[in-house]
Structure formats: C-alpha cells, structure tokens
C-alpha cells in the first residue's frame, strides 16, 4: 500500500482538490416547444432539434 513520505500542506491539498467541485449539466431549450432538456437528448414531448422523433403517450 502506498504511503506518503511527507505531509501534504493545506495549500497543496487544496490545489490537488481544485477540480473536484460539482458542475451543472448543460441544458438546451427545444425551439418548437420551449421545453428545457439535456443537450443531445430528446425533450419529454419527444422532440429533438425541432422535429418529432418519438411518439409519446399523449399523442
């Protein structure tokens, strides 16, 4: 098992963890319905890039 030889200072510890924060998912707005959805995913109504691609229960 690896064991560090010297204690890592708080500054170095912070630098090591600087990219561990959470980011928000990029969202897109469907132009035909105005719904918000994840990028490169279909909207809940079944639209993708302004075209109906999947039939939903409401249709």
UniProtKB/Swiss-Prot annotation:
Q: Name one GO cellular component term.
A: large ribosomal subunit
Its domain of life reads: Bacteria
Task: List compositional bias (Basic residues) regions by residue number.
Answer: 49-59
> Has UniProt tagged this entry with the keyword Ribonucleoprotein?
yes
Q: Name one GO molecular function term.
A: structural constituent of ribosome
The alphabetized UniProt keywords are: Ribonucleoprotein, Ribosomal protein
An example of a Gene Ontology BP annotation on this entry?
A: translation
Q: Does the keyword Acetylation apply?
A: no
Q: Where is this region: Disordered?
A: 1-59
Q: Which family does it belong to?
A: Belongs to the bacterial ribosomal protein bL32 family.
What is the name of this protein? Large ribosomal subunit protein bL32
Q: Which organism is it from?
A: Burkholderia mallei (strain ATCC 23344)
